[in-house]
Amino acid sequence: MAPAVGIDLGTTYSCVGVFREDRCEIIANDQGNRTTPSFVAFTDTERLVGDAAKNQVAMNPANTVFDAKRLIGRKFSDPEVQADMKHFPFKVIDRGGKPVIQVEFKGETKVFTPEEISAMILQKMKETAEAYLGGTVNNAVVTVPAYFNDSQRQATKDAGLIAGLNVLRIINEPTAAAIAYGLDKKVEGERNVLIFDLGGGTFDVSLLTIEEGIFEVKSTAGDTHLGGEDFDNRLVNHFVQEFKRKHKKDLSTNARALRRLRTACERAKRTLSSSAQTSIEIDSLFEGIDFYTSITRARFEELCQDLFRSTLQPVDRVLTDAKIDKSQVHEIVLVGGSTRIPRIQKLISDYFNGKEPNKSINPDEAVAYGAAVQAAILSGDTSSKSTSEILLLDVAPLSLGIETAGGMMTKLIPRNTTIPTKKSEVFSTFSDNQPGVLIQVYEGERQRTKDNNLLGKFELTGIPPAPRGVPQIEVTFDVDANGIMNVSALEKGTGKTNQITITNDKGRLSKEEIERMLAEAEKFKEEDEAEAKRVAAKNGLESYAYSLRNTLSDSKVDEKLDAADKEKLKSEIDKIVAWLDENQQATREEYEERQKELEAIANPIMMKFYGAGGAPGGMPGAAPGGFPGGAPGSNDNEGPTVEEVD
């Protein structure tokens, strides 16, 4: 049984780590990369996840899904979902008030929820860990932005279930990064540490005090919809306008052209973190026009300056909430790829009166590192001294309360309350002889509930007739360590109770839906494995035929073989190669059958050459898939399948 892992499920990239024998290892995927793109692609023949999906995005923009984290746990009507849909090349539709993604897969129209797409990415991270650890991985800690609300957390937990994971805990990304920093630094005395986490799609700021293994979050703030993707969008829009000016054509009407431009913009943005200027060269971008241009760092900073500046508001808020002056912050730790942007580093440094931020931890891996440590702790691994002393105290990011007369929000749990927590308050009826009360639970900071987010509601009925203000109804809020909440109400006179686990009113997937999705995920996994075996059989046959052809052209072999045998074998090889060209989509069994036919002719002929010493199949690549590139998974994405694309 493999140990528990920590998974950073990111908007644009994901990362998995394991903590064992007193050290954390970040695990590379099958392409050798320590982060995996959070992309899932659907084609006519297969489903691709990670690098393979991102690599083919320009050829298949409408069926390549990314940014599921920007949709998860949100309503379709959410203005941010509506704004994102304008940028997405794939189709997002409304199903019961929730956004779902519609794609073409194996010739059919399929619909997937953001939870299912996220589950596919989690499953990929699970498989990456399993390949490295050599066992089944069941338990994981999954991270979310600190500013994720209740429904987004619950939906992320559901995604873990669909991926076949037991989610030990949902933890906040900046808190995970703080653990990575704290363990790495062996912090002495009490330190106030500000974590500034700006990733591909989300932004968090948390202020913690770290002292002797106790990580106490004092306050947190952020924007669940700000990150590197938004900077890419600014660049894309800038170049679309430039293309219009230069060529009088609007390339935004073409999904493929937009995708190629976006990929170039993402690369340019990264280059501008280390160079003052970079060029973009895209051949035949739109209607045969080559697009060659350049951009300076100053221009990029100008295009994004309002977004960059907006990152300081949450910093302000975190310090105010924690009642700490900026001069009392000992360390500023940068997390997330977007903190490599020099302008952002300068803004932070200026804000803290010239104090340089700490860059000692890897911004791409810190969150997975901290999650892996937390996974080791929660799965009871106390073998390491560093983990046995850690205590995490996190907070609820948003105030929680109920609606009282006049549509007012009465807060029971103010924001930045340490969790887990439990709080009760007594309410009463608003009118005489009122038989029941409707309890509506909200999260948010505004005075009126209509400006806050409704999490759920339930009724408490059967209250005996009494004048207003007499019945005593005790409402209890209970927030667990994942930041997910239970609310119960008790009428003290009759002892009647009712309760609700706030799992995103209406939007939450039901148990049946999760089970159906889990079964579907298993089915997709089996299909993926079958496809890998089919490709391996095809590669095996191809490499066997070609290696035989090479053997025949070798002069040593040529001399010793009978002309008739040689002719017979040559024509059979030509026949197989021609058949392969015609049948790229044949079944695994057909390829294996052809391999057997070829072996039946080749083996006796080659036996003559090797004399009695050469056992059948004793030559290179004789066994199916026994040739470089033949093993499943070794070359799935760039093997001989390249010839299918015309």
Curated annotation (Swiss-Prot):
CDD domains: ASKHA_NBD_HSP70_HSPA1. Residues 613-646 are annotated as: Disordered. This is Heat shock 70 kDa protein. The lineage of its organism: Eukaryota, Fungi, Dikarya, Ascomycota, Pezizomycotina. Belongs to the heat shock protein 70 family. Pfam families: HSP70. Induction: By heat shock. Keywords: ATP-binding, Chaperone, Nucleotide-binding, Stress response. InterPro entries: ATPase_NBD, Heat_shock_70_CS, HSP70_C_sf, HSP70_peptide-bd_sf, Hsp_70_fam. Residues 613-632 have a biased composition (Gly residues). Disulfide bonds: none annotated. GO terms for molecular function: ATP binding; ATP hydrolysis activity; ATP-dependent protein folding chaperone; heat shock protein binding; protein folding chaperone. GO terms for cellular component: cytoplasm; cytosol; nucleus; plasma membrane. GO terms for biological process: chaperone cofactor-dependent protein refolding; protein refolding. The gene is hsps-1. PANTHER family: HEAT SHOCK PROTEIN 70KDA. SUPFAM superfamilies: Actin-like ATPase domain, Heat shock protein 70kD (HSP70), C-terminal subdomain, Heat shock protein 70kD (HSP70), peptide-binding domain.
